């Protein structure tokens, strides 16, 4: 193939899925001349699986992306067909927003957003090779021979990386949704010395809405007063579409059991490791054989399509078996299957080959983000893409990378887990993975991250001024409640009695009364009137910060303790072989991961407290080993 010089850029982003679009937008908006290359321009920000955004932990990630200046939250607010706040009956640490998106509107709106950015060039092209000079990535080469040069490159190829679709006995090379896969780039990464592993994910069949008997299902409406993902969104759409709940049954399970020998999950044809937290229906009936039924949610894929996503029925059984089992489910007895469910296997770069900036250790100037790093989910991909784009642009401008701490963001937890622990299966973000989840809430993402977003140039001055005003209003109202004393008047006592709260014996500070579990900020506002208007967002923040003050303080003390460990940096030139006393496994892991701090070293699987003590003594005594020649 004859090659030709096709142009020079600051940053090149390979792929335009959920990681790629955030990487490209971040880089371009920070002032870097950015090229985005994608196999198919019609697939920008496409949702090949569930047409939804958010959920536990993931919804908080979308808020964090928005607080830093990313696009996923704004785009979802423009294109949702249903919005629900989950876990409203639980504490604020686990509340999360989830949207059903119009998958077609979502991708078209995102593509239009990218096309409007003056620093971004969006082109169709299949990247086969990287341009590497002296261990530094200098650009990419496409299958048409075009050579694009750049100072940094971000790979976000997702499940296209040597993708293979599997349906029963049928197996063929393909990206998601029967798109062209990226084969040669995977081969090239292996040639460069990267360790790749085969992972697997799956998707359920899509069925025709007009052939569903919804009277046999349970309606799942959106919230009456939907909330936004983006801190910029003002007006919310009230015209929402419902989802519908139904269940599998013993007949469904019998059909699946009878055909397990034809499922790639249980035959030698499956090579990739699947996602633990997104099991196929075959996997569910085997692992949970005692359950007589499993939930199935029928989710519309958009306003202008008949296609309905059958959530909970991810499968790679043969096509005729899928049709048969669908028709055993209440409401789907006469359903028409429009698209068959399938499994897809793909290559993932083992993420312990990355620095916390998402730059690869093997090749300078090369970043990876999204499912290629071993994660599952649009939100996890978008969060990584944003950080990779930010750090790729900052490297161009000779600035230090932005690395979010585990106490700052779920995105920080995600990336730290990946680069420190690696992953043996597709990684899904869960609230249980965050040790400081009371600090990493849906409601306070802007308070945690807007400062950083503004500092790096992704949050406008106008939005930053609004943020500062909100911050001031929260503090002013908290201070007012700390100073305002409520007297035990007849009116107050009657209100307390009505809601089952103990009567007052003496006067009480408004803040102390608010700490009672049954007392809301609205109740306090009825007793203690205020002169200035307080938005619902500010009221919510005041209530949470006052009510959970003790728990938040405890978490902050834990963070301070952890930060002292983060501040103990491990010198770049350390020779672990020169440290006597380290366990063999710890020595191997420390040499492979190359942690930046004692705190990161302590989180590596196989490195125990005794190893950390030895490492600390070695560093503190100044015994920094010789630099390898």
Curated annotation (Swiss-Prot):
What does the UniProt entry say about where the protein is found? Cytoplasm
User: Could you tell me which Pfam families the record lists for this protein?
Assistant: GIDA, GIDA_C_1st, SAM_GIDA_C
Give the required cofactors.
FAD
Q: Where is the composition biased (Basic and acidic residues)?
A: 215-227
Which amino acids does the record list as binding NAD(+)? Answer: 274-288
**Could you describe the subunit structure of this protein?**
Homodimer. Heterotetramer of two MnmE and two MnmG subunits.
A GO molecular-function annotation: flavin adenine dinucleotide binding
**What NCBIfam families does the entry give?**
mnmG_gidA
The organism's superkingdom is given as Bacteria
The molecule here is called: tRNA uridine 5-carboxymethylaminomethyl modification enzyme MnmG
Q: Where does FAD bind?
A: 15-20, 127, 182, 371
Please provide, in alphabetical order, the Gene Ontology terms of the cellular component aspect for this entry.
Answer: cytosol
């Amino acid at each position: 193939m004859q090659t030709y010089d096709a142009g020079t850029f600051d940053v090149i982003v390979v792929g335009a899925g959920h990681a790629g679009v955030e990487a490209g937008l971040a880089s371009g908006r920070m002032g870097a001349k950015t090229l985005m290359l994608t196999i198919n321009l019609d697939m920008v920000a496409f949702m090949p699986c569930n047409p939804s955004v958010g959920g536990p932990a993931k919804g908080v990630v979308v808020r964090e992306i928005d607080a830093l200046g990313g696009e996923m939250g704004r785009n979802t607010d423009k294109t949702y067909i249903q919005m629900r706040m989950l876990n409203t009956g639980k504490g604020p640490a686990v509340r999360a927003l989830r949207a059903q998106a119009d998958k077609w509107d979502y991708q078209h709106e995102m593509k239009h957003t990218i096309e409007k950015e003056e620093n971004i060039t969006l082109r169709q092209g299949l990247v086969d090779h990287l341009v590497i000079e002296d261990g530094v990535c200098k650009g990419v080469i496409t299958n048409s021979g075009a050579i694009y040069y750049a100072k940094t490159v971000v790979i976000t190829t997702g499940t296209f990386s040597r993708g293979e679709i599997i349906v029963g006995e049928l197996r063929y090379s393909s990206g998601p949704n029967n798109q062209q896969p990226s084969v040669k780039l995977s081969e090239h990464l292996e040639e460069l010395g990267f360790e790749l592993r085969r992972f697997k994910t799956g998707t359920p069949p899509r069925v025709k809405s007009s052939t569903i008997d919804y009277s046999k299902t349970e309606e799942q409406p959106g919230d009456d007063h939907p909330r936004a993902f983006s801190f910029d969104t003002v007006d919310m759409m009230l015209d929402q579409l419902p989802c519908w709940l139904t269940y599998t049954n013993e007949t469904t399970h019998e059909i699946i059991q009878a055909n397990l020998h034809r499922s790639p999950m249980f035959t030698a044809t499956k090579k990739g490791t699947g996602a633990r937290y997104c099991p196929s229906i075959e996997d569910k009936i085997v692992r949970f054989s005692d359950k007589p039924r499993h939930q199935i949610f029928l989710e519309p894929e958009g306003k202008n399509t008949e296609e309905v996503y059958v959530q909970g029925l991810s499968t790679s059984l043969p096509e005729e078996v899928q049709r048969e089992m669908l028709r055993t489910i209440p409401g789907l007895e006469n359903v028409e299957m429009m698209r068959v469910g399938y499994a897809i296997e793909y290559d993932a770069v083992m993420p312990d080959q990355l620095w916390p900036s998402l730059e690869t250790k093997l090749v300078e100037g090369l970043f990876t983000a999204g499912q290629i790093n071993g994660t599952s989910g649009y939100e996890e991909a978008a969060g990584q893409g944003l950080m990779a784009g930010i750090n790729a642009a900052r490297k161009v401008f000779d600035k230090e990378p932005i690395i979010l701490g585990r106490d700052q963001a779920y995105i920080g937890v995600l990336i730290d887990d990946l680069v420190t622990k690696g992953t043996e299966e597709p990684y899904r973000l869960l609230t249980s993975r965050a040790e400081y989840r009371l600090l990493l809430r849906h409601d306070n993402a802007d308070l945690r991250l807007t400062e950083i977003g503004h500092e790096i140039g992704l949050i406008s001055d106008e939005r930053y001024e609004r943020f500062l005003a909100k911050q001031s209003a929260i503090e002013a109202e908290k201070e007012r409640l700390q100073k305002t004393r409520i007297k035990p008047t007849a009116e107050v006592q009657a209100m307390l009695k009505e809601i089952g709260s103990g009567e007052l014996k003496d006067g009480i500070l408004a803040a102390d009364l608010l700490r009672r579990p049954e007392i809301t900020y609205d109740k306090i506002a009825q007793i203690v009137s205020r002169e200035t208007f307080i938005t619902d967002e500010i009221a919510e923040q005041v209530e949470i910060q006052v009510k959970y003050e003790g728990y938040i303080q405890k978490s902050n003390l834990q963070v301070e303790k952890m930060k002292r460990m983060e501040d103990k940096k491990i010198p770049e030139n350390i020779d672990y072989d020169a440290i006597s006393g380290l366990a063999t496994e710890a020595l191997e892991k420390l040499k492979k991961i190359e942690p930046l701090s004692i705190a990161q070293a302590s989180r590596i699987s196989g490195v125990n407290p005794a190893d950390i003590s030895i490492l600390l003594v070695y560093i503190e005594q100044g015994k920094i080993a010789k630099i390898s020649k």
